Amino acid sequence: MNRCTRLLLPKAAITLAAVLGACTTTRGPASVPTAERTGQSWVVTRPIIAAQVLDTCSRPSPGREAGRVSGYWAPSRQQVDQLEARLSSLEAQVPKVLDFDRQYVGIESAGKRLIYINAFHLPDDSGVNPAREAIRVCDGGAQFWGAVFDPASNTFSELQFNGGFGGP
């Protein structure tokens, strides 16, 4: 093998591999599927975001009653697990209650530590981070709801749905 052949042979092999690789009919998936489950939950810990979550526009919430919320706190993993273990008790009022995504806000009210639930359906590709952003929707009916959970009594109260869609 002469010197010229030794230099050109590797270049020719690389070019041939690139051409053949471009002609292949086997392709990988256009996108990688994710296995996110429905009904995810996030604890909101920043007070300014917590106040925004409670500032609902088409349903009553503790944050809309002047002076009712005296402070915020972060529910523990155990308290969130306790709440989520009881969610199915709302199934009669909220069909498929476990399919809703939820934000949890710890509120202090009348000397009690309660957890406010803001429930919604978040699109998979929304780019929104419910742990750091308030999810606020006006109208929407039963697709958006809120409730209060009392960890001390293990009960829900104040279940409220958003108002209906406006217009004729």
Task: Name these PLM-found stretches.
Residues 2-13:
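Bacterial N-terminal signal peptides that target proteins for export
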Residues 21-22:
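C-terminal motif of bacterial Sec signal peptides marking the signal peptidase cleavage site
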Residues 27-145, 149-168:
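Intrinsically disordered, low-complexity acidic regions enriched in Pro/Ser/Thr
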